[in-house]
A protein has these predicted regions:
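Aromatic- and glycine-rich beta-strand/loop motifs that create alpha-glucan
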Residues: 1-22
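Central hydrophobic cores of alpha-helical transmembrane segments
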Residues: 24-30, 352-363
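Selective transmembrane-helix segments that form parts of the transport pathway or gating/packing helices
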Residues: 24, 64-65, 96-123, 338
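Short, membrane-interfacial amphipathic segments enriched in basic
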Residues: 1-6, 43, 312-316, 320, ...
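Helix-loop-helix units of permease transmembrane domains in multi-pass membrane transporters
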Residues: 75-106, 330, 450
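Short cytosolic juxtamembrane segments of multi-pass membrane proteins
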Residues: 452-460
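Terminal transmembrane helical anchor/hairpin motif
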Residues: 38-47, 124, 129-315, 362-447
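Long, hydrophobic alpha-helical segments
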Residues: 57-79, 114
């Protein structure tokens, strides 16, 4: 272990001496320190200003450190091989796999230090912005919706199976299922289920619905504890900028102590909105009941998607949420380090950097690429939009995207900006999947190639 750590210390010193590393560090520090004075958000609320700063700063840290990691991991081995400096190491009594592991440890240790320093600057700048003067409602929104950690509970979905069975029974009695195959009947059942689910999430003009949010772990007796109803209404006609007028009341009608006053409000469709609710509206079973009515004259409103209507409640503090987000970013950097080092064992620096950048871009856009590949498939008997290349390229692209880790699976920056919890499960998943499995596999392959290769061999 002492040999690995010696190589790691040498790698850190080498990275600090590298001009490109210093440039990245200076640029990142300058931007992080200047952003608090330049971001404006929506130009009205301090909440929006803090959210804009967190989004830009954390996104910038992840982007710049990813670039720095790719450059350092692809250049440290490749440059030593190209400049023949590796021969001085090869003659020493240290196995090549330990040399490879020391390189990885040095780069990820430097990344960890830079992440901690960046996190401290982000936290300090956020604290500075928090102290800026603003009006009371904006201050409350900042504390309750950004500088906190909230867990989201989705609407409790009722059991539609009895209603589906009744509809199927009527169709069978009418003889409309007699000549239909088993798969066709299954499709009919799924369509009915989706129709009922959509209707349950739909509010016609003048119509009201009762929704419930269960398992809310809040202190009902504390008047300072509040929840937020987080929702995104949509117009069933797909029209933008429609004003949704709603009337709602929170509380359990079987427990008058939980009933809150009736409220009304206007909300623009296709945008997320948050409405504060006192914790006293939650009943003894930890359930929040909501009755909401559409008082818009003509428009039908739909809450589409699993995240279109949630109840949020606080469970922690901002700084630990920030630390978890930085931990996930570090796991991604550790994977990129292993990838860059493995590529540089048999490729020259430009080619290794190009390959690593390609995988970084695919990993970042993995979710979008998967949807794009699926969308490029022909529908039914329609001609293939990719002509004769489609049957060949789509499977290859699907396999490539499947092999590359999906960085878009988790959004730690978005959760920090929205005051949402960065789950510990995300951190564990990133650590296991990116570092202990995929990173370890790349490290073993890279160490094996580096051990077997002829150092004097020319790489391209």
């Amino acid at each position: 272990m002492s040999r690995i750590w010696a190589v790691a210390r040498h790698t850190i010193a080498e990275c600090i001496r590298t001009r490109i590393a210093v440039v990245f560090i200076v640029v990142m520090a300058a931007i992080l320190l200047s952003l608090p004075f330049s971001v404006a958000g929506d130009g009205v609320t301090l909440k929006s200003r803090v959210q804009s700063y967190l989004s830009y700063s954390l996104g910038l840290v992840a982007f710049l450190l990813s670039l720095l990691t790719v450059f350092l991991s692809c250049s440290t081995l490749a440059s030593e091989i190209r400049l023949r400096q590796i021969f001085m190491i090869a003659c020493k009594p240290i196995p090549r796999w330990q040399f490879f592991a020391g390189k990885w440890l040095g780069i990820v240790a430097m990344d960890a230090g830079l992440l901690l320093a960046s996190g401290a600057m982000v936290w300090g700048a956020t604290w500075y912005l928090q102290t800026r003067p603003t009006y009371d409602e904006d201050r409350k929104a900042l504390d309750a919706e950004v500088l906190t950690v909230r867990h989201g509970v989705k609407i409790g979905v009722p059991d539609f199976n009895p209603m589906v069975d009744e509809r199927i029974r009527k169709l069978r009695e009418e003889g409309r299922l007699n000549d239909m195959s088993l798969s066709g009947r299954r499709t009919i059942r799924d369509d009915i289920q989706e129709e009922l689910r959509t209707g349950w999430r739909m509010l016609k003009p003048g119509e009201y619905k009762d929704y419930t949010f269960g398992h809310l772990l809040v202190d009902r007796e504390d008047p300072k504890v509040w929840l937020q109803l987080h929702f995104k209404p949509r117009s069933s006609a797909g029209v933008e900028d429609v004003i949704f007028k709603a009337r709602w009341q929170c509380g359990d009608r079987d427990d008058v102590n939980t009933l809150m006053p009736v409220q009304e409000g206007e909300f623009i469709v296709n945008r997320f909105h948050e409405v504060p609710v006192p914790a006293a509206a939650v009943n003894k079973e930890g359930v929040l009941r909501l009755r909401i009515q559409n008082i818009t004259d003509h428009d039908t409103i739909v809450f589409e998607g699993s995240d279109s209507f949630e109840a949020l409640y606080g469970i922690g503090t901002f700084h630990w949420n920030l630390f978890r987000a930085l931990s996930i970013i570090w796991c991604r950097l550790a994977f990129l380090t292993a990838l860059g080092l493995a590529a540089s064992t048999f490729l020259s620096f430009p080619v290794a950097a190009m390959v690593t950048f390609l995988i970084l871009m695919v990993a970042t856009a993995s979710g979008f690429l998967s949807e794009a590949i699926a969308g490029a498939a022909p529908a039914g008997t329609a001609p293939d939009p990719m002509w004769f290349l489609g049957p060949v390229l789509r499977p290859l692209a699907s396999v490539f995207v499947m092999l590359v880790p999906d960085f878009s699976k988790f959004d730690p920056v978005g959760n920090v900006v929205g005051g949402r919890v960065v789950p510990l499960l995300w951190v564990i998943d990133s650590m296991v999947r990116l570092v202990l499995i995929q990173g370890l596999i790349l490290g073993l392959l890279g160490a094996a190639v580096f051990t077997k290769r002829e150092l004097a061999q020319v790489t391209v």
